[in-house]
Amino acid sequence: MLALVPLYAGAANDDENDSSEQFDWNPVMEAIILVESEGNPRIVNGNQVGAMQITPIMVRECNNILKARGSEKQYKMTDRYDVEKSKEMFLLIQSQYNKSNNVEKAIRSWNGGPNYSNRGTERYYQKVLRRMK
């Protein structure tokens, strides 16, 4: 239900770096997991693996973000099979590219990449919305 998570949610304060940490992405992540893998963390579909169907490009992008932020943390390709680490990667991507915590943008870009089209991601977007609690 959209009543639990608005489609556009601003940060609780003006600090953009903290906005995704303050916003509750759990309903979105859980719905994406159900759509992507029915919750199976071992699923493989081409180069997309794990509960959130993360690609090697996504892992590299997360590592680039971490490096740019001065972090020594780095994700491994096997981390895609770990649901909690997959969620961390999702949150990291949101904190970098979706600072306004726009749920629609998060869902569509998870499916279609940063240059998604509404038309190309509409089916996926609707499936995720139906799975949100």
Residue ranges of model-derived segments:
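Hydrophobic h-region of N-terminal signal peptides that target proteins for export
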Residues: 2-11
